[in-house]
Regions:
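Alpha-helical transmembrane segments
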Residues: 55-63, 172-187, 242-245, 249, ...
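Long, contiguous bundles of hydrophobic transmembrane helices that form the permeation core
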Residues: 4-9, 31, 38, 174, ...
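Transmembrane alpha-helix interface/packing and boundary motifs in multi-pass membrane proteins
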Residues: 13-21, 70, 104-113, 144-150, ...
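Core transmembrane alpha-helical segments of multi-pass membrane transporters/permeases
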Residues: 26, 45-80, 98, 106, ...
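Hydrophobic alpha-helical transmembrane segments of multi-pass integral membrane proteins
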Residues: 64-65, 92-124, 311-355, 359-360, ...
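Membrane-interfacial loop-to-helix junctions in multi-pass transporters
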Residues: 1-4, 54-60, 86-100, 131-139, ...
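Re-entrant/interfacial helical elements at transmembrane boundaries that shape
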Residues: 68, 81-83, 116-128, 155-167, ...
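Membrane-core helix-loop-helix motifs of multi-pass transport proteins
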Residues: 127-221, 358, 368-369, 379-425
């Protein structure tokens, strides 16, 4: 009974989110609550909700302060010199231009937002592609690949996986650093090859990176080196585990505000400017905590896993991560991030655990493609339409051109994960 009720709840959740009949927050709260009431748990289900919220709180705190921190750093101009350096280095050489596009996307995507990455990188590089006569599909592909392999502890897929499985984002990410470096190396190699194939016309004037008047008033060029050192310190202490991620970004944000915008009024304006992006995702993560808490505490998730395990050979459990890693990128075309990470991933992780595996391996396998390399071409994410529109290419043309390279990147990272023993074959 519990297994059937849990399956019905998950399918209802996925259906509501994919059909846009209600927002993810509404579905993540009301669907499991309704299932718990039908299952006879009554108001006792609230303790499961509280347990879920408690487990997700550190992840939510990290996300909020990471988004605010990188937003303030972008306002202060941390990225501007990097953009100018890349534009100056690439010159008129197609190979450098395409590789520079990927490098710039990797740097800008440090804030964890694919949309922001595309909004900064593509307008900055598009004039260069135009004056050199380069294929704009290459621009879209290079930016997409770089953002796709750049899964970080504070990016959406990692946070969702951590929230769904009650794990820390750092524990998921740290073993994947080598895999990510292999993915980045592959992206750079592909960009070199795409640039080598490209033909360029002689440019009479290379574009420059210009700022609006509003952006100029926010910039703090005299504090660039401090901001760079602070950012490296925040990321370094977080990855090495010296301090918890939420605390690292919290302290970093406070220092960034005091040094760059010492007036309290200016600090408030900067926080308000980025609060919407931070709180929207934070609300979804908190609702996901309610969902996972109810599904786990009520026993529905375990009942599904037990039922599925009874129909699978025990030896087959070891292959779940590698199969998921291979399929993760194409699955981005079928599931949006919320429906997959909060609906599908917990079931796969529970089955893998019951067959003798570690749930964290399933999370790491999902990160290889599900809404990482998959999001720039998935029709279920607005960012995929954004990258095509900003590049000035047809959406279907972008999909056809970029999909093989994005899938290849996920396959290369799957091989790397096996080689580094992140999960077994």
């Amino acid at each position: 009974m519990l297994a059937l009720l849990g399956i019905a709840a998950i399918l209802t959740l996925i259906g509501l989110i994919l059909s846009n009949r209600c927002s993810p927050i509404v579905a993540l709260v009301l669907v499991p609550a309704g299932a718990a009431l039908i299952g006879g748990f009554g108001f006792g289900a609230t303790k499961f909700m509280v347990a879920g919220l408690t487990s997700i709180a550190p992840v939510v705190a990290m996300f909020i302060f990471a988004i605010l921190y990188f937003g303030v750093m972008t306002d202060a101009g941390l990225i501007d010199p990097l953009i100018r350096i890349v534009l100056r280095i690439v010159g008129r050489h197609p190979k450098r231009v395409v590789m520079g596009t990927a490098l710039l996307a990797l740097l800008v995507h440090l804030d964890g937002s694919g949309a922001v990455c595309f909004l900064v990188v593509i307008p900055a590089m598009l004039p260069l592609y135009q004056v050199l006569g380069l294929d704009r599909r290459v621009l879209a592909c290079a930016a997409s690949m770089a953002a796709g392999v750049n899964f970080l502890p504070w990016t959406g897929p990692t946070l969702r996986a951590a929230a769904a499985l009650h794990l820390s984002a750092i524990s998921i990410f740290r073993p994947m650093i080598g895999v990510q470096l292999v993915g980045i190396a592959f992206v750079m190699a592909v960009c070199w090859w795409l640039g080598r194939k490209a033909s360029a016309t002689e440019a009479t004037e290379l574009p420059s990176h210009t700022l609006t008047a509003a952006e100029q008033t926010l910039r703090r060029p005299g504090r660039f080196w401090f901001n760079l050192a602070l950012t490296l310190a925040v990321i370094g202490t977080m990855i090495t585990g010296v301090v918890p991620p939420a605390i690292a970004f919290m302290v970093g944000l406070a220092l960034a505000l005091v040094i760059n915008y010492p007036k309290p009024a200016d600090q408030r304006v900067r926080l308000e400017a980025h609060a919407r992006a931070a709180l929207t995702m934070a609300g979804i993560l908190l609702a996901a905590g309610v969902f996972s808490g109810l599904m786990s505490g009520s026993g529905m998730l375990n009942a599904i896993a037990v039922a599925a395990t009874s129909h699978l050979p025990r030896a087959g459990g070891a292959h779940i991560p590698v199969v998921l890693a291979i399929l993760s990128m194409p699955l981005s075309m079928l599931f949006d991030p919320d429906s997959f990470y909060f609906g599908v991933l917990p079931v796969l992780a529970a089955v893998h655990r019951n067959l003798g595996g570690e749930p964290i391996q399933v999370a790491q396998a999902a990160l290889i493609g599900q809404m990482t390399t998959g999001f720039p071409i998935s029709p279920l994410t607005p960012a995929s339409f954004l990258v095509a529109g900003l590049s000035g290419v047809d959406y279907s043309a972008h999909q056809r051109f970029s999909a093989p390279w994005l899938f290849a990147a996920s396959l290369v990272m799957t091989v790397a994960a096996l080689a580094f023993r992140v999960f077994p074959l």
